[in-house]
UniProtKB/Swiss-Prot annotation:
CDD domains: GIY-YIG_UvrC_Cho
Organism: Syntrophomonas wolfei subsp. wolfei (strain DSM 2245B / Goettingen)
Domain of life of the native organism: Bacteria
Compartments reported by the entry: Cytoplasm
Transmembrane parts of this sequence: none
Protein name in the entry: UvrABC system protein C
Domain GIY-YIG intervals: 15-94
GO MF annotation list: DNA binding; excinuclease ABC activity
Stored PANTHER family: UVRABC SYSTEM PROTEIN C, UVRC/OXIDOREDUCTASE
GO terms of biological process kind: nucleotide-excision repair; SOS response
Entry GO terms, CC: cytoplasm; excinuclease repair complex
Similarity field: Belongs to the UvrC family.
InterPro entries the UniProt entry points to: GIY-YIG_endonuc, GIY-YIG_endonuc_sf, GIY-YIG_UvrC_Cho, Hlx-hairpin-Hlx_DNA-bd_motif, RuvA_2-like, UVR_dom, UVR_dom_sf, UvrABC_protein_C
Entries under SUPFAM superfamilies matching the protein: C-terminal UvrC-binding domain of UvrB, GIY-YIG endonuclease, RuvA domain 2-like
Amino acid sequence: MGDEMLKERLKKVPLQPGVYLFKNQEGQVLYVGKARVLRQRMRSYFQAPERMHPKVKAMMAWVSDFDFIVTHSEMEALILENNLIKSYKPRYNIDLRDDKSYPYIKVTVADKFPRVYLAREKKDGVSRYFGPYTDVTSLRDTLKLLNGVFGLRSCRTMKSRRRPCLNRDMGKCLSPCSGEISEEEYSQKVQALITFLEGDFQEIVREKEKEMAMAARSLEFEKAARLRDQIQSLRQLGEKQKIELASPYELDLVGMLSGEKENLVLVFKVRSGKIVGKDTFWLKRPIQEDENEAMEFFIKHYYDENPDIPPEILLSHLPSESKLVEAWLKSRVSHRVELRVPQRGEKKQVLNMLLENARLLLEEKQREENKQLAALSHLARVLDLEVVPNRLECFDVSHLAGEETVASMVVFVGGQPEKKAYRHFKIRTQQNNDTASLAETVRRRLENARQANPAFLPEPDLILVDGGLGQVNAVAAVLQEMNLDIPLFALAEKNEEIYRPGKSQPLVLAARDNGLQLLQRLRDEAHRFAIEYNRKRRAKKIRSSALDEIPGIGKQRKKNLLVHFTSVAKIKEASLDEIAAVPGMNRKAALAVIEFFHNQD
């Protein structure tokens, strides 16, 4: 995806907190980051190269796609960022993020008189853990506040204590060590604290607000200010952490929303209570298929390809045959699998967050589709076409000084790339003649369609070639020879002029014209695809011409050498012993390699 296309997509990114993922052409995650405002933060990566940090500039050279997950708060985004970095281990996050774990609030509920304190890890299965939290300093202050509000003990042990500590005199401890509070009363305080940490903090906030108002009326301004600060801290701590669930659940969340032409399915993978991955799927919806049937199809398809099946799968809609699907899932793993729609609690809240992300994606796609349909309609008017084109194809040629000449064919349907329809061509005739190469490519493409080759069907509604008048006339001759009446145009890169067959005067559209921008996207994608294939061909030729000529070095040995040394140049620099140590090699074969490169030099 070109830089301009990414910038266009960036305009649709919401102004909300969340996490973004930059990816390369293969879909590998290169970088995970968080933002208080997603669009603003992501936009900073697309500024002028000279203004970028060298590391950022190096990363962006590989970025060809991005994804994002919207969260309810920046705190959630921080935690999700941490989880995703640990999960994906992106190349460009290694030096930019540490691998520390965020702290938790631990309540030792198994103790007779539980205490609450900060913990870095979940070390036992009996205590209650809340968090994690990202601001350690604020968390320590809040812990002091909680101990003051609820009066729980802060001492490590009560065994050696014979009299109350200073906290009791300051009103910050209920002093269970001195017997001033019963186990039952203390337990009620612990439960109140747990209820607060679970998110039900409005009641205590209301009580504090009443106290603050009374203090203000009594002119106790210092007390009122202290209560105001406590309320702010309580609200900050009370912000629910939906990105990490309270228990170490192993589950998937699957949410489905219906668009006009297809269903969008979003999958969040939760492992050890953390969201560690996101998958997005678009399902073309058959006529009269309801959401339950669509969900059944997706579950079967997704988990047939994915062996990582957790014991619990939470859904926005149950499959039409949920019990049958559960039995099928169980047959694929060694444990029971439950499918259900959560009705309340934190699981319901996380599913709602997933569906909010799905809604944003669906709305973005619908806006983009409407925009592209408008661009196609406009293009039909300015190019004087009889019908609005749906399938657009663009052809481009790439070579280096006439070496390894190749051509590309890219396809846009409805204004969007149809990558499964992309094709490469190795030029068979004139290697150093772009015009002749374009004519050959279009001829071969159309001949394949005429022979009913399914890989080249249907025929295009419009053909675009990279070039000017010479290129468009050469391809027009092919269409005339084949008796085909397909609208044909060329787009010249220098001045972005549109050429038509037999007309020397180009059509010039405004730079912001949405029809021109669509043709530019199509042309740039064909250019990228052609260059990529040419580079692969030249790299393959370099590797094969060197190693395939060495006696005793077959396909497997060549592969082992390239895997071990990563390049032919490094093989040439290696010693006899280093080459002989490669799996599958021996001293005789290593000597043949050494002698071959020695004779070459």
